[in-house]
Amino acid sequence: MYHNFLINSTVPERTVRFLISKSKSIAVIVILLAVLVVLALLYRGNKAEEQFEQGTTMAMDTVFMVKVAGDKPDGYIELVNKLDAALDVYDEDSEIYKLNAKQNANASDVLLDAVKSSLQAEEKLSSVSITAGGLIKLWDVNGDNPTVPDEDDIQKELSFVGKDKITLSGNSITLMEGTKLNLGCCAKGYACDIIEKKLSENNVSCAIVTFGSSTLLYGKKPDGERFVTAVTNPFEPSETLLTVKTDECFISTSGGYERFFEQNGKTYSHIFDLETGCPADTDIMSVTVICDSGIMSDMLSTELYIGGTEMVKEYLASDEYMIIAIDKSKNIYASDKLSESITLKDKSFTLK
């Protein structure tokens, strides 16, 4: 008999922020997690399931969940809370919020490593930047009053975007006047990388970590089978579109259906094209990236969403990344290496 274990939430992170305060009980969070799901892992038998202990909390305005075999979840909860205190750009007490306000700070090792890791990942990409915080704040898609800004204001914020707008010297981080950091494009994937290191140090045999749209599948399942992950239908987020079998890996998904607002009959998502300063105009509904790096899975899924199907096709034969992308015509583009691993659940879609 199969037992479903729900590991990730489809609820928009902005919605989570309004529905749940950090003081709410873990039980409420778990109920939300169980109802609103992107990914699911299937475990065979009660005996294997009993080897795991689970912990859940709120961090960076979304649900963090760890399920670990052979260890207690408390240390991982403590670690993600430490990351949250440094990287949550919406928390006025966070380190990154204070850096944005002062434009200069002697950073903690946590913030400094996150920024360095993000900038290194950006070297492989062209459409994603952690320096776009001002642009994101201008549009306020994640806030109470999102609106389409004036073009002059958009261009002004774009002038503050770029790797050359941030200077690192020792533990010091200096931002060009007007530049603001926002690690929303990578923070959860980065957190999964940090959690993986701790799992390895603790000699954990198997763990599942889910943090918003990013997931870490670690080690080997007790039953010896591969992990089975369910990918949501972006047109009907409560439904499963397909399942994919993988070994241990990082998985991140980006999609404009997650967070958006409408104005004058047009929909604007939370993912920005840094060429225009506007939400990406793309033929993609969602992109899932599977690879051996949390931060790259997170940032590349965003990059491919912005780049659309033409960019997606360039990655389908990649040795480093496995891709599953769904376009607005219900076509599914999947990496060659996944051809034997995907099971399509909704036959109204076409697997290319």
What does each model-found stretch correspond to?
Residues 2-352:
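Mature catalytic core of soluble alpha/beta enzymes
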